[in-house]
């Protein structure tokens, strides 16, 4: 049995157009916002005179509400809207790097550069501050580190809520901010400062 070729799905029309509209009369909403109730046959003729389609947009109204528009353009707008929605709903990867409350400056700078890079690429990030042994008594140092991370990453992202303790770990989440990232990239391109290389990354699950 031959496999059927996959076909791209076009936006479904959820309303009637032109001759499909068979009610006696309709309410027309004109581009300037004015309205007029008229016989459907007259509305269809007017649509033809305007070189547009008569499109029913509120079938449950009494009488049904219609407008004059180009069906092809309307379908294109619907397709673009669906495309934009899918982009917004696109899932991002959660990246994670670990710190310790006594992380030195070199290690802090190195790891935050990686977190910054992750955010610039549109990923959410999680900084996990691990308290080994009795270091859990120094929770204030962990919170101070979380504040330093927040300040450092504020150029490309925003912190999600407050840092959260779970056992001997402190979790700090950040999400990318497109406006900040765009501004950051413009400054980078003008100054010519090379971006920090990204060597390895770790994926984490929500």
UniProtKB/Swiss-Prot annotation:
<dbReference type="InterPro" id="IPR036788">
    <property type="entry name" value="T_IF-3_C_sf"/>
</dbReference>
<dbReference type="Pfam" id="PF00707">
    <property type="entry name" value="IF3_C"/>
</dbReference>
<dbReference type="InterPro" id="IPR036787">
    <property type="entry name" value="T_IF-3_N_sf"/>
</dbReference>
<comment type="function">
    <text>IF-3 binds to the 30S ribosomal subunit and shifts the equilibrium between 70S ribosomes and their 50S and 30S subunits in favor of the free subunits, thus enhancing the availability of 30S subunits on which protein synthesis initiation begins.</text>
</comment>
<dbReference type="Pfam" id="PF05198">
    <property type="entry name" value="IF3_N"/>
</dbReference>
<dbReference type="GO" id="GO:0032790">
    <property type="term" value="P:ribosome disassembly"/>
</dbReference>
<dbReference type="InterPro" id="IPR019815">
    <property type="entry name" value="Translation_initiation_fac_3_C"/>
</dbReference>
<dbReference type="GO" id="GO:0003743">
    <property type="term" value="F:translation initiation factor activity"/>
</dbReference>
<dbReference type="GO" id="GO:0043022">
    <property type="term" value="F:ribosome binding"/>
</dbReference>
<keyword id="KW-0963">Cytoplasm</keyword>
<dbReference type="GO" id="GO:0005737">
    <property type="term" value="C:cytoplasm"/>
</dbReference>
<protein>
    <recommendedName>
        <fullName>Translation initiation factor IF-3</fullName>
    </recommendedName>
</protein>
<comment type="subunit">
    <text>Monomer.</text>
</comment>
<dbReference type="InterPro" id="IPR001288">
    <property type="entry name" value="Translation_initiation_fac_3"/>
</dbReference>
<comment type="similarity">
    <text>Belongs to the IF-3 family.</text>
</comment>
<keyword id="KW-0396">Initiation factor</keyword>
<keyword id="KW-0648">Protein biosynthesis</keyword>
<dbReference type="InterPro" id="IPR019814">
    <property type="entry name" value="Translation_initiation_fac_3_N"/>
</dbReference>
